[in-house]
Structures are given as C-alpha cells and as structure tokens.
C-alpha cells in the first residue's frame, strides 16, 4: 500500500499559492521524502511570520521553479497513492486543488485521512467549553504520542537534504508520518 504523508506552506490562508510542499512516501518496501520550494509572486505578512519564507528567500530556495514546473511529478505521486495523510488535510487539499486548477488540471487522489480529526477521540483533549474534545494541534499530538522534536529532526535528516522546525513542511510531514507509525505500534490506529 502506497501512503503519502504531506504538508504545505502557503502564501496565506485563502487558496493562493503553495510555497513549499513536502511529503513522505511509504510504499511497503521503502520510505522516501520529497521537498519542493516554489517561487511565488507574493507572501502575506501573516504567513511569512509563521513560516519565515519571503518572496526573495523562496526565489533562492526554489531555484526559480514554480509549482507548475513540478506539476506532473506531484500529480503522479498523489494520484498513484492509495492514501494521502495530513494534519488538517482539508486545508492542504484545498491549496493543491487550487494550484492544479491554475494549470487547468484536476488534483486527483484516491482517499485521504486527516490526522487532526482521526486523533481527536484518541487524544481526548478537553475543549474550553468542557463539551466534547478539541482537535489536537500537531505539537499536542506529538506530545501525546511521546514523539520529541529531536525524533522529528533526525527523521527529517534521513529523508530530506535538510531539516526545518515546526511550520516547515518537511518537519510537519515527517511529524505526521511518525505519529501514524507510533500510533500503529501502540495499537491506537489500524
């Protein structure tokens, strides 16, 4: 079974542009990471505050490549995966769908799993209203599963040419991969 664990960093909150896409591909035989930075025409100040990527920095990191330059590779990887997994996956799928639509293409995938929603009844973090449970932030999920930042950094260095901190798509994609792996080992997830 081919599974992709992924995350995006974006130019803002409404589907604008993806400035970084990272994913871990697990196909039963091997695990590999892919990280892509993209040149973008703008980054909202609020987004830059979160991930630290300016238009100039992205131009350098991407080597001038735009999302459309890697569209075929991304389309193949995601459309051939049996499952794609992300934390608040609906957000990331929305941006991927938008990027594909800019090129008059359709973003295709078979099935998705949102780790944020799937782990809500497992983590059981109380809401401030004391009714039901709140969605765990990725950091809260890692803490619940006893996955530490150095675990994520070590795995990033094994899968990618570099490593970033929280709100770098490499970090978040690897964190989701490790969370699902650990949850399966603990029998919390099938």
Residues covered by each model-derived region:
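P-loop/Walker A phosphate-binding loop and immediately adjacent motor/lid segment at beta-alpha junctions
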Residues: 103-111
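Acidic, Mg2+-coordinating catalytic module of metal-dependent nucleases/exonucleases
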Residues: 80-90, 95, 131-190
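Conserved non-catalytic scaffold segment of RNase H-like nuclease domains
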Residues: 1-104, 140-147
């Amino acid at each position: 079974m081919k599974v992709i664990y992924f995350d995006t960093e974006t130019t803002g909150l409404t589907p604008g542009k993806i400035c970084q896409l990272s994913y871990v591909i697990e196909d039963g035989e091997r695990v590999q990471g892919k990280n892509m930075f993209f040149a973008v025409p703008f980054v909202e100040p609020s987004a830059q505050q979160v991930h630290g990527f300016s238009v100039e920095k992205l131009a350098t990191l991407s080597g001038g490549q735009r999302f459309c330059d890697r569209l075929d590779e991304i389309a193949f990887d995601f459309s051939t995966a049996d499952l794609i997994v992300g934390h608040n996956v609906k957000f990331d799928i929305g941006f991927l769908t938008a990027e594909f639509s800019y090129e008059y293409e359709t973003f295709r995938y078979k099935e998705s799993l949102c780790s944020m929603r799937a782990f809500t009844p497992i983590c059981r973090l109380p809401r401030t209203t004391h009714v039901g449970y709140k969605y765990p932030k990725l950091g809260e999920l890692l803490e619940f599963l006893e996955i530490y930042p150095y675990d994520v950094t070590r795995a990033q260095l094994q899968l990618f040419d570099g490593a970033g901190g929280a709100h770098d798509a490499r970090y978040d994609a690897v964190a989701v991969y490790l969370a699902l792996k650990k949850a399966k080992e603990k029998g919390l997830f099938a």
